[in-house]
């Protein structure tokens, strides 16, 4: 059941991202994307407050007990999470009206394709990236630099413990502060996207990640680590805010669903190379003690540089394919 629910959640992200170009004109895509990302990080806090009483019997951090609600352990979090997920999704499900089909017979409802048809459609979508300049290069760039970002997220707690000596009591406040920074960073990035363009903003964000990885690797004390963590949290929000508008302007209206599907595939594939590189460095330099974690973190710069390499093949068009300039 957990695997099925996770499949549904990940699949919903494709449609959620593809809706973005339908909600706002190009000049406001960044701002709307930033609002969505910031709301997601705010939801992380709200979710803890709403579901926490079912797990611990009280509101986390506040100790407030809700009459009739008893602590049920971690397993008791799933049902209320599903209910709240549905409730928060209802405004979009009820108010959003997708544009009508541009052609074809609309009298028949949509049919569910078989697995062979799905595989053929994925293959066709990959081939179609050649028709739209920059799409394939962007997806490859996204694969590498998001790989570095995902790896930092996965191993941040281990790095904080092994290198900086953070106890568990400090880890949670640290990640909460980084989450707040991510929400604020997404709002700032949204305005920068609308002012500078998504491609230029993304390049600055990637450069910022290189600087932050260097700062993280060289952090001499916990204060410097806190600074690096807050900056990386802000840049994390920037990554998700800038990537979606860039893909939206690179692909034609009416085809966003297919290409955001490839975008999601690229993001999921980005969970392979980075952890493998990080783990290999840690294993090879085992004799260096905690310093090996610094080396492993610094090696992630190579992935971001690969992202820069492929991003050279991307040029931001004056208008999306099939869209009138200035729309």
PLM regions and their residue ranges:
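Helix-to-loop junctions at the C-terminal end of transmembrane segments
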Residues: 184-198, 282
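Multi-pass alpha-helical transporter architecture, strongest
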Residues: 84-95, 298-327
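Short amphipathic helix-loop junctions that connect adjacent transmembrane helices
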Residues: 154-171
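Hydrophobic core of transmembrane alpha-helices in multi-pass small-molecule transporters
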Residues: 1-12, 224-238
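Structural signature of the two symmetry-related core transmembrane helices
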Residues: 200-215
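Intracellular juxtamembrane helix-capping segments at the cytosolic ends
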Residues: 11-24, 238-252
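Juxtamembrane intracellular "pre-TM" segments in multi-pass secondary transporters
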Residues: 99-140
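A membrane-interface helix-boundary motif in multi-pass transporters
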Residues: 53-83, 280-304
């Amino acid at each position: 059941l957990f695997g099925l629910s996770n499949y549904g959640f990940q699949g919903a992200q494709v449609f959620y991202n593809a809706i973005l170009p339908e909600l706002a004109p190009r000049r406001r895509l960044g701002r709307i994307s930033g609002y969505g990302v910031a709301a997601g990080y705010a939801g992380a806090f709200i979710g803890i407050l709403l579901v926490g009483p079912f797990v611990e019997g009280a509101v986390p951090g506040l100790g407030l007990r809700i009459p009739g609600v008893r602590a049920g352990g971690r397993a008791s979090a799933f049902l209320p999470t599903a209910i709240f997920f549905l409730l928060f999704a209802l405004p979009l499900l009820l108010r959003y009206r997708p544009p009508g089909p541009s052609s074809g017979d609309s009298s028949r409802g949509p049919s569910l394709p078989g697995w062979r048809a799905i595989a053929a459609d994925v293959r066709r979508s990959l081939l179609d990236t050649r028709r739209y300049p920059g799409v394939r290069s962007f997806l490859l760039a996204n694969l590498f630099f998001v790989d570095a970002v995902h790896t930092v997220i996965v191993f941040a707690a281990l790095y904080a413990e092994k290198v900086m000596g953070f106890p568990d009591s400090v880890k949670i406040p640290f990640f909460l502060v980084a989450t707040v920074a991510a929400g604020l960073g997404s709002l700032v990035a949204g305005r920068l996207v609308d002012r500078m363009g998504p491609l230029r903003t993304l390049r600055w964000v990637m450069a910022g990640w290189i600087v932050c990885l260097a700062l993280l690797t060289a952090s001499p004390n916990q204060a410097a680590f806190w600074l690096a963590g807050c900056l990386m949290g802000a840049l994390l929000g920037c990554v998700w805010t800038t990537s979606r508008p860039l893909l939206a302007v690179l692909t034609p209206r009416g085809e966003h669903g297919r290409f955001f599907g490839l975008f999601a595939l690229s993001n999921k594939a980005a969970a392979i190379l980075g952890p493998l590189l990080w783990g290999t460095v840690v294993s090879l330099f085992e004799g260096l003690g905690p310093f090996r974690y610094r080396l492993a973190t610094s090696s992630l710069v190579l992935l971001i540089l690969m992202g820069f390499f492929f991003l050279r093949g991307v040029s931001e068009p004056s208008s999306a394919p099939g869209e009138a300039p200035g729309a």
